[in-house]
Amino acid sequence: MNMGMPMPSWYDIVGLDERSNEKCKGLAESRATVEGILQKEHDSTGLPFNRMILVGFSQGGALSLFTGLQFDQAIAGIIVLSGYLPAAKQCQPKHLNIPIWHGHGTMDPLVQFPMAQKTKETVEGLGVKSYTLESFPIPHTLSPAELQKMMQFLAKTLPPDDSCKIKLKDPKDMSIKELKAAIRKAGLGSKAVGLMEKSEFIKLVQDYRDGK
């Protein structure tokens, strides 16, 4: 791919043909990265794994499918946009009831539609019980109709649940490092100049959250 020249990617792609036998160099590392993000989100916000959905386009969709099926925790769902299942022979799903929605263009020249059909067949052959593949008359891109269908899947898979609202850590329970990170993220660096005591950092973060 890319005439043999390196380019940003989740893992190495050799060609555009059948990819189930590809080694996909870098795939395991990228999977670990995504799993780390999910775990960090859970640890920092308290958001349950069953309220998380992995979504990706093209190679990102492939990684989402490969990771979501094998993550130790059961997530709410997986959305694949113009993607496929890489390294299919290495994939060992841990949760067979995760709903998957796959949108794909019938005119896609990069990840051709037969590969999407093969992916659905392969994943179902691994025992996954809910895999929906929908086609759209588009190339390797997204369309309003596809996004609308995706939103319908999201609404069905993640209905409103106030009990699962993200819980922000109380500033009083934060370490100095966490307080400084929160201050940088909120763009409060100028207001933190000259502050020395932890109590001052706590007050700055708390006042910001309270809208003061």
Located regions from the model:
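Post-His helix in hydrolase/transferase enzymes
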Residues: 142-156
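Basic helix-extension-helix modules of the SAP/HeH family
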Residues: 162-212
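Serine-hydrolase catalytic machinery in alpha/beta-hydrolase-like enzymes
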Residues: 1-51
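Catalytic histidine neighborhood in serine/cysteine hydrolases
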Residues: 99, 117-141, 149
